[in-house]
Amino acid sequence: MSQPIYKRILLKLSGEALQGDEGFGIDPSILDRMALEIKGLLGLGVEVGVVLGGGNLFRGAKLAKAGMNRVVGDHMGMLATVMNGLAMRDALHRANVNAKLMSAFQLNGICDTYNWSEAIKMLCEKRVVIFSAGTGSPFFTTDSAACLRGIEIEADVVLKATKVDGVYDCDPVKNPNAVLYHKLSYAEVIEKELQVMDLAAFTLARDHNMPIRVFNMSKTGALRNVILGKTEGTLICD
């Protein structure tokens, strides 16, 4: 059997990835499939941290444009990621996977408050750790949270799960002739103005030499292929 090329990963799942074709909320079948794919990684000996977005439930930035205070909107968005985290933890438990949900701010009785040393300890015990509530501060995206937590837990890579096969030279949804990149440097991403993630998140990863791999989570087996070093998605590193 092939061996994994990563020992510890940070998996970033967008809220949109959880909603499937529903357009809103959480598709239980997708949640269960993701839980089983994560379980498969544990079987390979990989330690898994997860950061979830909240865009399937709430988008603070969008309402801020309509007049809502941005801080209030972002706080609501953080709570949406906690809701997704609760759903993911439940799906993992139903798949007989030991998982812990942590929040960047206190939510006593619902989940644990984020603690770096405790997170490391649980990862070493082969428990899946779900990091919710973003960074705990407004004005930062969940991509920033993913890169931050990935750096903190000393992950080998941040895996950004999307609905497309990787990073393209233009929008593949609008242009069927878009070209998929298999490997890019941080400098190339900035030079070509490719939309991998927001600049704050991307520069954080770059400054700490944290590799990023963008791949299509909707493809069954894609996550496992990434872990086994097969050609899947786009790798961004120096």
UniProtKB/Swiss-Prot annotation:
EC number: 2.7.4.22
Pathway entry: Pyrimidine metabolism; CTP biosynthesis via de novo pathway; UDP from UMP (UMPK route): step 1/1
Main location as per UniProt: cytoplasm
Binding site for UMP: G54, D74, T135, G136, S137, P138, F139, F140, T141, T142
Positions of ATP binding: K12, L13, S14, G15, G55, R59, T162, Y168, D171
Enzyme class, first EC level, given as a word: transferase
Regulation: Allosterically activated by GTP. Inhibited by UTP.
Gene Ontology, cellular component aspect: cytosol
Catalytic activity: UMP + ATP = UDP + ADP
Compartments in which it is found: Cytoplasm
Record-level Gene Ontology MF annotations: ATP binding; UMP kinase activity
Keywords recorded for this protein, A-Z: Allosteric enzyme, ATP-binding, Cytoplasm, Kinase, Nucleotide-binding, Pyrimidine biosynthesis, Transferase
Superkingdom field: Bacteria
Annotated stretches, region: Involved in allosteric activation by GTP: 20-25
Subunit organization: Homohexamer.
Entry-linked PANTHER family: URIDYLATE KINASE (PTHR42833), URIDYLATE KINASE PUMPKIN, CHLOROPLASTIC (PTHR42833:SF4)
Name of the featured protein: Uridylate kinase
Organism for this UniProt entry: Histophilus somni (strain 129Pt)
